Amino acid sequence: MTPLDAKRPLQLNDQGQLRHFLSLDGLNRELLTEILDTADSFLEVGARAVKKVPLLRGKTVCNVFFENSTRTRTTFELAAQRLSADVITLNVSTSSASKGETLLDTLRNLEAMAADMFVVRHGDSGAAHFIAEHVCPQVAIINGGDGRHAHPTQGMLDMLTIRRHKGGFENLSVAIVGDILHSRVARSNMLALKTLGCPDIRVIAPKTLLPIGIEQYGVKVYTDMTEGLKDVDVVIMLRLQRERMQGGLLPSEGEFYRLFGLTTARLAGAKPDAIVMHPGPINRGVEIESAVADGPHSVILNQVTYGIAVRMAVLSMAMSGQTAQRQFEQENAQ
């Protein structure tokens, strides 16, 4: 267990409800299932003529992204708007943070504007935990991705994708392929799959892109694509994160594709009804062949759709948990 994992009680209020969403570590199957069930119920909102429910009316959600993002930032904005929240998205490149203002000073200024929730993406592992410890406890913190550590909403939208296409987790074989070492998505997915009862979790990567101690996640490790993909139900491809790499981990992107790229021929070794997933952005011809990314096995665009519903679920549940905690503290202070 890492020091980051030891901080997991921060996420829950005294009634065991979600109040922050920082990591999937330490959250039990019942809570993860509640998130999935709540997200399922929100999917129909996207099909309405008026795509709104009033659950966060009068609340303010601030998106504070210190790393670039398209899908995550946009889907969080849409999720908050569909819950009727007021939404502020901070452009860090043009904010005072670019002039040397610290992370906490930036957030405390937003807190002083009566924000109710921060969605934070940051390049440092543990940033979301740090913020949850040091801002006003009445502000809910949602981790939009922190360094290599965690991307919990991506993990949950991947779980919703799998559940909706496969019905459950108890009899599945799932392969996670690519840059495991630098991937917060891989870590969140491994934790979620284990918690939800998936019996066969595989990781496939070159040895240089496997983290030390990965066996603690209860996964089977493969360094050969043909062997690792044999009879799997789900293939989750990961982007090569060159921006987090130091030299020498890979000879070239072409060599990686030759050995670990998902091609139609390699996918034939999986089950005939296998699904292919990718958190995006996709590097075609590096980790995945276009014919696979756009083919009948791909559910990549479904992931984006499900991501809005999952983020609606997390925002609404965390806000509800914060409200319940304030009421609990007020009652016990009397």
From Swiss-Prot:
Pathway: Pyrimidine metabolism; UMP biosynthesis via de novo pathway; (S)-dihydroorotate from bicarbonate: step 2/3. Pfam families: OTCace, OTCace_N. It comes from the Bacteria. Carbamoyl phosphate binds at residues 71-72, 121, 151, 154, 280-281. L-aspartate binds at residues 99, 184, 239. Its EC number is 2.1.3.2. GO terms for biological process: 'de novo' pyrimidine nucleobase biosynthetic process; 'de novo' UMP biosynthetic process; amino acid metabolic process. Belongs to the aspartate/ornithine carbamoyltransferase superfamily. ATCase family. Heterododecamer (2C3:3R2) of six catalytic PyrB chains organized as two trimers (C3), and six regulatory PyrI chains organized as three dimers (R2). NCBIfam families: asp_carb_tr (TIGR00670), PRK00856.1 (NF002032). This is Aspartate carbamoyltransferase catalytic subunit. It comes from Pseudomonas fluorescens (strain ATCC BAA-477 / NRRL B-23932 / Pf-5).
